[in-house]
């Protein structure tokens, strides 16, 4: 399970260090794709296979299903870690997430998310304000 928040910078070649604690769980490679709210989702290959199986069941007759799968898969890339624990991010994903230099890597259960630091701070501040209300709306999961 992924958790925690880590700050790292993109290097001049567009590579990002993924913390060792997360890499240990991910393995030698991962799949990165467009995430929600302007971040990048990163999945271990085993989790990606589960998502692929679910997406394959979406009906091609539904416009939203076609649109979502196009964007989700067209932005996807498999990335391997180099010896320093860095992963090379595609220009498409960097643009989607607004990544320039400072990044925040967030562990979120079965995936990691990569955010531009500024965007993460805005999102986090807003989400913190409504955290209690969100928890009440999700009371059926009984935390």
Curated annotation (Swiss-Prot):
Residues 5-47, 76-119 form the SpoVT-AbrB domain. GO terms for biological process: negative regulation of DNA-templated transcription initiation. Pfam families: MraZ (PF02381). Keywords: Cytoplasm, DNA-binding, Repeat, Transcription, Transcription regulation. One of its GO terms (cellular component) is nucleoid. Its main location: cytoplasm. InterPro entries: MraZ, MraZ_C, MraZ_dom, MraZ_N, MraZ_sf, SpoVT-AbrB_dom, SpoVT-AbrB_sf. The keyword Transcription applies. PROSITE patterns: SPOVT_ABRB (PS51740). It is found in: Cytoplasm, Nucleoid. One of its GO terms (molecular function) is DNA-binding transcription factor activity. Forms oligomers. Belongs to the MraZ family. HAMAP family: MraZ. This is Transcriptional regulator MraZ. It comes from Lactobacillus delbrueckii subsp. bulgaricus (strain ATCC 11842 / DSM 20081 / BCRC 10696 / JCM 1002 / NBRC 13953 / NCIMB 11778 / NCTC 12712 / WDCM 00102 / Lb 14). The lineage of its organism: Bacteria, Bacillati, Bacillota, Bacilli, Lactobacillales. The gene is mraZ.
